[in-house]
């Protein structure tokens, strides 16, 4: 499974990769990096944060909503998009944009007691079972 992890928080990336899961994953900190990579590579899963700047937030920076629009406008292919942002309004906007375009989206605000890798595996297994019908 190839995963693109879009988040400016290095601690989340460390938590995500701590168990050395055998997936190819790549972290980017800014929307511009993500659009560049998505224009060149394909991913099975894209994990999206919304706010892409450590406080103080600069509203003029591209955010997860901008990336969701890019994904739709450029018809980026992936099996699952995970929205892990704690920003409820931003996550709701991304969810609306992506689901209206037909993407399989998992709304999963990242709380430290959740294991995002386990959630991703369950979603992958569910899709594999559905594809095999």
Predicted segments with their positions:
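Catalytic phosphate/metal-binding cores of nucleic-acid and nucleotide-processing enzymes, i.e., regions
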Residues: 1-133
């Amino acid at each position: 499974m190839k995963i693109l992890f879009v988040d400016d928080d290095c601690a989340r990336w460390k938590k995500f990769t701590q168990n050395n899961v055998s997936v190819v994953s790549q972290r980017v900190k800014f929307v511009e990096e993500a659009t560049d990579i998505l224009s060149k590579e394909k991913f099975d899963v894209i994990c999206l944060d919304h706010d892409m700047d450590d406080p103080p937030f600069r509203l003029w920076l591209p955010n997860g909503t901008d990336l969701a629009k890019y994904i739709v406008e450029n018809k980026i292919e992936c099996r699952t998009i995970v929205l892990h942002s704690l920003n409820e309004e931003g996550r709701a906007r991304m969810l609306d944009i992506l689901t209206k375009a037909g993407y399989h989206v998992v709304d999963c605000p990242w709380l430290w007691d959740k294991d995002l890798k386990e959630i991703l595996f369950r979603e992958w297994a569910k899709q594999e079972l559905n594809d095999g019908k």
